[in-house]
Swiss-Prot record:
It is an enzyme of class 2 (transferase). InterPro entries: CUE, RIN3_plant_CUE, Znf_RING, Znf_RING/FYVE/PHD. Disruption phenotype: No visible phenotype. A zinc finger (RING-type) spans 337-379. It comes from the Eukaryota. It is a multi-pass membrane protein. It comes from Arabidopsis thaliana. GO terms for biological process: plant-type hypersensitive response; protein ubiquitination. PROSITE patterns: CUE, ZF_RING_2. CDD domains: CUE_RIN3_plant (cd14422), RING-H2_AMFR (cd16455). This is E3 ubiquitin protein ligase RIN3.
Length: 577
């Protein structure tokens, strides 16, 4: 095992302690030799002896070095306990956040704090403690996001990092109590600054505990579900319990998360306003910087409130416009949401009989390109026969979600006048709905959607190759590939995001001669095998790429697929353009 920073910190801490002890003994011997103190130090003269020792600059330097080494050792020990080794990107973000926090929070203190030794030591300790708590909190959130995106993370690994948030919260609450004691003892308004930032960190930590606590609970439930194999009825009730938990998770994350977010912003605003009140209005550069910070915080608060109101209105409009799925439909389909891959206790039913969570469906509809809204599973258009003015309305004060709700309501009313319904139940003809399929291509070349694992009607669980959850996993995978070394096609296929075509498998195992592959203009090129020239494979892979990147022109997708013959490599290349 190599030497780490923790081992070096232990050694330097031991050396500083030995140095401080040796210097203290030498100083006491010198004071005894001069007759300033007696040989036996009692409780009565201990205060005088301590003052004599601290009068030496060497003693103060050694004591400060020992305290600093103790602090570094404690931080490194906690880092090793909760996080282990840090990734390079985590270290870089940590340094950037630390510098920004010191600049934004510590720069204004000299303008309002009295310039004495006691005040300097007190506010230095305050800033150091808050920086430590803030960095551990940010590091825990980043690592939890990384574990949430990793398919190999376990509940124990997640809980190990999650417990760091409990450590931050408990330490922060103790620091708030200590700050209140100092403020009540001294009574000066300057010491009120001790409270704003710790309260803001507490609210941020509570929000992180709320969000990632549900993630940990979901991971633990899924881990137990993999181990236990019960009967179909028990499986249904378990899915209903998980679906109810998901509904509560969305409700709490939306409402309580908004409250905690607003409380954090209000604490930051109060911190800057109190500094401005203590400093006074002098029209200096400091006042201009404070004004800009306050203006940015006020803008963030107003934007957050408007966003929350719009979200509530949008969810209410969609909830009233879409039909609720009955418990019989949920039991018959034994379904999970094709967007978030979670069970459903409550669901909304589209006209094609596919079921989704309300929030997931809204997120999907928000990504509609040029307002061409379709079912996430079967790609049937949600609105048929719209005029051009309806397809591109002048928005004004009407939000896109209200516009969607009106279209759903108009379609629901028109369904009662039709005998066969708005959407037929037979398999849709994708060669007619997609404009890029109108070229003169032999219909026998085209692979059906059933070969790609996509169900047409009924259960949406069959469409695991499409849907927002798989697209997010693909993006996370590409991000991890970008940070590390280049992966092969077999590594890409091991994720199981899309079914691997035989042509792709043959391409992965094809020998690449020297100079045939490589990079050209920043794009990853793969040798195209003879079997990859099959138009059916190209069309099937193009469909998959269009699920991830619907805004990319079809010609560019075809050109890159002809070079790479790989869905993952093509998506990676198009993202680099």
């Amino acid at each position: 095992m190599g030497i780490t920073y923790l081992h070096i910190s232990v050694a330097t801490t031991a050396l500083s302690f030995v140095g401080l002890q040796v210097w203290t003994e030498l100083s006491l011997d010198r004071l005894r030799a001069d007759g300033i103190i007696t040989k036996n130090i009692s409780l009565g003269n201990s205060e005088n002896t301590l003052e004599l020792l601290l009068s030496s600059h060497t003693t103060i330097a050694l004591l400060a070095s020992f305290v600093l080494n103790i602090y570094i050792l404690l931080v490194l020990s906690l880092k090793t306990l909760f996080f282990g080794d840090l990734y390079a990107i985590e270290t870089r973000k940590l340094v950037e956040r630390l510098a920004n926090y010191i600049i934004y929070k510590g720069t204004f203190l000299p303008f309002v704090v009295p310039r004495t030794v006691f005040q300097g030591v007190l506010w230095t300790i305050w800033l150091t403690v808050l920086c430590t708590l803030k960095m551990f909190q940010a590091l825990a959130r980043d690592r939890l996001d990384r574990l949430n995106a990793s398919p190999s993370s376990t509940p124990w690994t997640y809980f190990r990092v999650y417990s760091a948030l409990f450590m931050v919260l408990s330490t922060d609450l103790c620091w708030i109590k200590l700050s209140l004691m100092i403020y009540n003892t001294v009574g000066s308004s300057v010491y009120l600054l001790l409270l704003f930032e710790p309260c803001g960190i507490a609210f941020e930590t509570l929000q992180a505990l709320l969000i990632h606590g549900f993630q940990l609970l979901d991971m633990w439930i899924n881990h137990l579900a993999v181990k236990n194999s019960d009967c179909q009825r028990s499986k249904f009730y378990d899915s209903m319990t998980a679906g109810s938990l998901l509904e509560w998770k969305g409700l709490l994350n939306r409402n309580l998360g908004f409250f905690l977010d607003m409380a954090t912003l209000v604490m930051a605003l109060g911190h800057y306003l109190h500094i401005w009140w203590l400093h006074g209005m002098a029209f200096h550069l400091v006042d201009a910087v404070l004004f800009l910070n306050i203006r940015a915080l006020l803008s963030s608060i107003l934007k957050r409130i408007k966003g929350y109101i719009k979200l509530r209105v949008a969810l209410g409009a969609l909830h009233a416009a879409l039909l609720d799925a009955t418990s019989e439909e949920l039991r018959d389909y034994d379904d999970e949401c094709a967007i978030c891959r979670e069970p459903m206790a409550k669901a909304k039913r589209l006209h094609c009989n596919h079921l989704f969570h309300l929030g997931c469906l809204r997120s999907w509809l928000d990504q509609g390109l040029n307002e061409v809204y379709s079912c996430p599973t079967c790609r049937k258009p949600l609105f048929v026969g719209r005029t051009e003015s309806e397809a591109n309305p002048s928005r004004g004060e009407v939000s896109s979600d209200e516009h969607l709700a009106r279209q759903f309501e108009r379609q629901n009313n028109s369904v009662h006048a039709l005998t066969t319904g708005m959407f037929p139940t037979e398999t849709p003809n994708f060669t007619e709905s997609d404009p890029w399929r109108n070229s003169e291509v032999d219909p026998s070349w085209l692979q059906t959607w059933s070969d790609q694992g996509v169900d047409v009607v009924g259960s949406s669980a069959g469409s695991r190759s499409v849907g927002l959850g798989q697209v997010q996993l693909m993006m996370r995978h590409l991000a991890s590939v970008g940070e590390g070394s280049a992966q092969t096609t077999l590594d890409d296929a091991s994720w199981g995001l899309w079914p691997m075509n035989p042509s792709q498998a043959s391409t992965s195992s094809t020998y690449v001669p020297p100079g045939a592959g490589g990079r050209t203009g920043g794009l990853h090129l793969r040798t195209v095998s003879r079997a990859a020239n099959n138009m059916a494979s190209i069309l099937a892979m193009a469909e998959t790429v269009r699920e991830v990147l619907p805004h990319v022109p079809d010609e560019i997708i075809f050109q890159d697929l002809q070079r790479t013959n790989s869905v993952s490599v093509t998506v990676n290349n198009l993202l680099q353009m």
